[in-house]
Amino acid sequence: MSVRVRIAPSPTGNLHIGTARTAVFNWLFARRHQGQFILRIEDTDLERSRSEYTDNILTGLQWLGLNWDEGPFYQTQRLDLYKAAVQQLLDSGKAYRCYCTEAELEALRESQRARNEAPRYDNRHRDLTPEQEAAFQAEGREAVIRFRIDDDREIAWTDLVRDRVVWKGSDLGGDMVIARRSPAGTIGQPLYNLAVVVDDIDMTISHVIRGEDHIANTAKQILLYEALGAAVPEFAHTPLILNKEGRKLSKRDGVTSISDFQNLGYLPEAIANYMTLLGWSPVEGMDERFSLAEAATVFDFDRVNKAGAKFDWDKLNWLNSQVIKEKSASELVALLQPFWSKAGVDTAAYPAAWLEELATLLGPSLVTLTDIVGQSQLFFSQGIELQEDAIAQLGQAGSKAVLQQILEALPSEALTLEVAKGLIDQAVKAAGVKKGIGMRSLRAALMGSMQGPDLLTSWVLLHQAGQAQPRLQAAIAAAQG
């Protein structure tokens, strides 16, 4: 059997990490089995769907490296196909028109709640006579179209993640609405469950891979596949992504969309890697840092967990830091440029080679790309504010003297690491202090703090940027004070 899977997001918001994780699993399964990965945009919710959300979804999937083989297909362009399926169900007696008003349905629900019963439609219009239908139409009532569900029916399937799943027809809430309310004799806008099934039949989807929150929909959809005379695909219901409290990750948890992660400085390789680990366990001997292409050679549902997957920021941060370390200096500079630009840093004033040296220096300490703004600030600033630990160091005996020696020996030409090492040795000897005093005093003067990246490399970069001399002069003045 040819594997054909799909991802079918609704453009009612930006690409959510849960939808993106589902896309990753679908993509991996398709690539593992040399199948097709199809993109479908379920945009029939006209009130909430927005073109900017569609753009965000497409851009997000591309950013993650999830290339699709067919699509994107848009449900709003396929309404005639859905209405034809609804008509087929009406003609075969498997669907009917229901004229209940919203007030009548709400009264039904209220009475059920009063009896501590789960709200459900009681199928009261399932077998209307032509005369009854005519009477409702004469009142000007519009009708939804409902699909008949036998309460005694057992719906079962072997799920690729959850093994055997069984639902009773009586647990599905009564006959299901498959088309919105419309005037007599017409078919209103088809609804989610009907449209999804028609699309999956038309696109010959072999495996439906989605979150476990769709299990109840699957039971309803299996009945629709059968009623339309189509083969039922295989299903895999993946675990939900949970927050640290064990509840489903939602917008209330803050960062949930792929564009949010992108703006925070996470790289697509890290996000895709981490999403694969959200519910899937690598094969024995496989490192947790892997590419999508590597995962696609071994991915299957035998290693997908049933239990919900808790979102672990520490794991994501570690993966992101590893991906950053894998980048070449030129690649990293290109990735960092948008974050420098957003922070108002004019990198055009600095040579490309200097920026690459800076990225090489700071890259190993970055967890996200946004970290570069704070960590690189002292290299772009025209002056620095001395922190308390730096002020204390500059007050140490010998600090002023060794800085004076370094300042006087500074070359007018480019400073190299070898020259910098020699200058330090000469300065501490001339000032009569230990090398540790010289190094700590130089750090305080150049960086304004006793913490920071490699001192000598930082010195070389600051000298090249024309900042070493004025900082030494300012530190000497502070030490005098």
Swiss-Prot record:
The keyword Cytoplasm applies. The keyword Nucleotide-binding applies. It comes from the Bacteria. GO terms for molecular function: ATP binding; glutamate-tRNA ligase activity; tRNA binding; zinc ion binding. Binds 1 zinc ion per subunit. Zn(2+) binds at residues 98, 100, 125, 127. It is an enzyme of class 6 (ligase). Pfam families: Anticodon_2 (PF19269), tRNA-synt_1c (PF00749). It is found in: Cytoplasm. Catalyzes the attachment of glutamate to tRNA(Glu) in a two-step reaction: glutamate is first activated by ATP to form Glu-AMP and then transferred to the acceptor end of tRNA(Glu). This is Glutamate--tRNA ligase. The lineage of its organism: Bacteria, Bacillati, Cyanobacteriota, Cyanophyceae, Synechococcales.
